[in-house]
Amino acid sequence: MMMGVELAFPKVVGKQVYGSLYECDEDVLKDTKRLEQIIKEAADIGNMNILDIKSWKIGEGVSVVAIILESHITIHTWPEYRFATVDVYSCGPHTSPLNAFRYIVEKLGAKRYTINEADRSSEF
């Protein structure tokens, strides 16, 4: 296992940006159609290609999963706490999961958030 090593020429590219969003706009967190639209726009901003989007209303919250050609984007919401989790993962060297993540943060109206980045690339 190589920890903390950046690969110069990975054969498999994997970039993941994920985090927790706090003090979000409660109305947006409840709105399935709006969340789907936000994911579509985020994918465009991150230069990703959406294959399919599925959503589920769970109580007041919503889970939205977008399968992108390059991997996935997810948003899970808890409006009663004004809280959401977001995960943007891409295997495309031409993509920007960070730009997509930042767009989602902005559109959910998060007053504060955590952000984590993982390089999941491999040289094989």
UniProtKB/Swiss-Prot annotation:
Modified positions (Pyruvic acid (Ser)) in chain numbering: 71
A GO molecular-function annotation: adenosylmethionine decarboxylase activity
Pathway noted in the entry: Amine and polyamine biosynthesis; S-adenosylmethioninamine biosynthesis; S-adenosylmethioninamine from S-adenosyl-L-methionine: step 1/1
UniProt keyword annotations, A-Z: Autocatalytic cleavage, Decarboxylase, Lyase, Polyamine biosynthesis, Pyruvate, S-adenosyl-L-methionine, Schiff base, Spermidine biosynthesis, Zymogen
A GO CC term attached to the entry: cytosol
Annotated catalysed reactions: S-adenosyl-L-methionine + H(+) = S-adenosyl 3-(methylsulfanyl)propylamine + CO2
Coiled coil: none
Enzyme class of the recorded protein, top EC level: lyase
Residues annotated as catalytic: 71 (schiff-base intermediate with substrate), 76 (proton acceptor), 91 (proton donor)
Sites annotated Cleavage (non-hydrolytic): 70-71
EC number: 4.1.1.50
Described purpose of this protein according to its UniProt entry: Catalyzes the decarboxylation of S-adenosylmethionine to S-adenosylmethioninamine (dcAdoMet), the propylamine donor required for the synthesis of the polyamines spermine and spermidine from the diamine putrescine. Has no arginine decarboxylase (ArgDC) activity.
Family according to the record: Belongs to the prokaryotic AdoMetDC family. Type 1 subfamily.
Subunit annotation: Heterotetramer of two alpha and two beta chains arranged as a dimer of alpha/beta heterodimers.
Protein known as: S-adenosylmethionine decarboxylase proenzyme
Source species of the chain: Saccharolobus solfataricus (strain ATCC 35092 / DSM 1617 / JCM 11322 / P2)
Lineage, opening ranks: Archaea, Thermoproteota, Thermoprotei, Sulfolobales, Sulfolobaceae
Gene label: speH
